[in-house]
C-alpha cells in the first residue's frame, strides 16, 4: 500500500515523532523511507545564505537516515534549498519526483511564529499533495 514513504524533518520534537511514525509504518508495510529537510535560503542583496548551516542540515538528514536504517528499513534522503516561503512546494515536488505513496510530517515545525502570518507548511502540504499526508502530533 505505502511502498515509498517521505518524512520531512526539521529538528523539532514534532518531526522526531513523525520520523518514528514513518519507521513504524515502513516496518508494517515493508516500505522504504525518503528523508527530506528543506532549508530556506534568504536571498540577500549580494548573496544567498541559508537560515541554518549546510553542515547542520546535512547532519539532520544523515542522523534521520541512520535512525531509519538502524531499524532495518531502507532509507535515503536529501537536503533541498529553497527560497523562503517555498518549503511546502519543495516537499510536494520531492514526493512527486520520488513516486512517494505517503508523506509523514509533524503538525508543527521550528518556524511556528512565521506560520501565524503565512500559513503552516504542513497545512500547505496537505492541500497540495496528490498522496495521503499523515500529520503526527
For each predicted feature, which ranges?
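Small/aliphatic-rich secondary-structure junction motif
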Residues: 3-51, 67-76
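Glycine-rich, Arg-bearing micro-motifs that act as flexible, cationic patches
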Residues: 102-127
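Structural beta-alpha unit
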Residues: 69-103
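Short, acidic/small-residue loops that bind anionic groups at enzyme active sites
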Residues: 124, 128-137
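Alpha-helix N-cap and loop-to-helix initiation/capping positions
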Residues: 48-56, 117
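Short, solvent-exposed amphipathic alpha-helices that sit
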Residues: 21, 55-67, 90-92
Amino acid at each position: 500500500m505505502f511502498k515509498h514513504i517521505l518524512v520531512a524533518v526539521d529538528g523539532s520534537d514534532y518531526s522526531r515523532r513523525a520520523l518514528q511514525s514513518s519507521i513504524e509504518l515502513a516496518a508494517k508495510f515493508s516500505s522504504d523511507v525518503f528523508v527530506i529537510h528543506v532549508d530556506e535560503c534568504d536571498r540577500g542583496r549580494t548573496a544567498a545564505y541559508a537560515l541554518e548551516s549546510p553542515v547542520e542540515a546535512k547532519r539532520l538528514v544523515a542522523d534521520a537516515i541512520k535512525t531509519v536504517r538502524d531499524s532495518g528499513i531502507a532509507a535515503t534522503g536529501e537536503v533541498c534549498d529553497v527560497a523562503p516561503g517555498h518549503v511546502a512546494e519543495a516537499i510536494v515536488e520531492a514526493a512527486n519526483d520520488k513516486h512517494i505513496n505517503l508523506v509523514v510530517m509533524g503538525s508543527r515545525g521550528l518556524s511556528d511564529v512565521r506560520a501565524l502570518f503565512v500559513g503552516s507548511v504542513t497545512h500547505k502540504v496537505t492541500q497540495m499533495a496528490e498522496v495521503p499526508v499523515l500529520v503526527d502530533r
